[in-house]
């Protein structure tokens, strides 16, 4: 079982982790959730157009 000081430290660390980007670890802006704007743009980009369906050759 955690002591009161260990419990407070765990809570503090949990809050800090929740306020950082899951991809790069940068502190998140108030309106950002899970990833920062830069990582969101990188992760959501589609450089190979793989998200677009190819036309059927039928």
Swiss-Prot record:
Q: Which InterPro entries match?
A: NinF (IPR008712)
Pfam family membership, one: NinF
**Protein family membership:** Belongs to the ninF family.
**What protein name applies here?**
Protein ninF
Annotated organism of origin? Salmonella phage P22
Protein encoded by which gene: ninF
């Amino acid at each position: 079982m955690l002591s009161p000081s260990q419990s407070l430290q765990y809570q503090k660390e949990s809050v800090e982790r929740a306020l950082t980007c899951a991809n790069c670890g940068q502190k998140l802006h108030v309106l950002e959730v899970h990833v920062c704007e830069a990582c969101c743009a990188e992760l959501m980009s589609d450089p190979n157009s793989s998200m677009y369906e190819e036309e059927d050759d039928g």
